[in-house]
Amino acid sequence: MHLSPREKDKLLVAMAAMVARRRLERGVKLNYPESIALISDYVVEGARDGRSVAELMQAGATVLRREQVMEGIAEMIHEIQVEATFPDGTKLVTVHNPIR
């Protein structure tokens, strides 16, 4: 199987998001890369499901709460930008203040 660098990046994010979900299920607080991966995966999958950019910008900020991440992580992440493939093409989705 031959994957482009973009496809490899998508797989790495998806795998990191899976690890993050398992840790949340066990009650483990997420670190910076896990938090970014989980929110990014949510946006990418939402785009794949046909949700709008505006909807994902709002919904992306509801994926994680402060109490689910390690201390200081919410303050470190001011915005997350994700390039996602929508039915009408690839678009950049920006989630402002993603952990509230």
UniProtKB/Swiss-Prot annotation:
One of its GO terms (molecular function) is nickel cation binding. One of its GO terms (cellular component) is cytoplasm. It is an enzyme of class 3 (hydrolase). This is Urease subunit gamma. CDD domains: Urease_gamma. Heterotrimer of UreA (gamma), UreB (beta) and UreC (alpha) subunits. Three heterotrimers associate to form the active enzyme. GO terms for biological process: urea catabolic process. The keyword Hydrolase applies. It holds the Pfam family Urease_gamma. Pathway: Nitrogen metabolism; urea degradation; CO(2) and NH(3) from urea (urease route): step 1/1. It is found in: Cytoplasm. The lineage of its organism: Bacteria, Pseudomonadati, Pseudomonadota, Alphaproteobacteria, Magnetococcales. Keywords: Cytoplasm, Hydrolase. Its EC number is 3.5.1.5. Belongs to the urease gamma subunit family. It catalyses: urea + 2 H2O + H(+) = hydrogencarbonate + 2 NH4(+). InterPro entries: Urease_gamma, Urease_gamma/gamma-beta_su, Urease_gamma_sf, Urease_subunit.
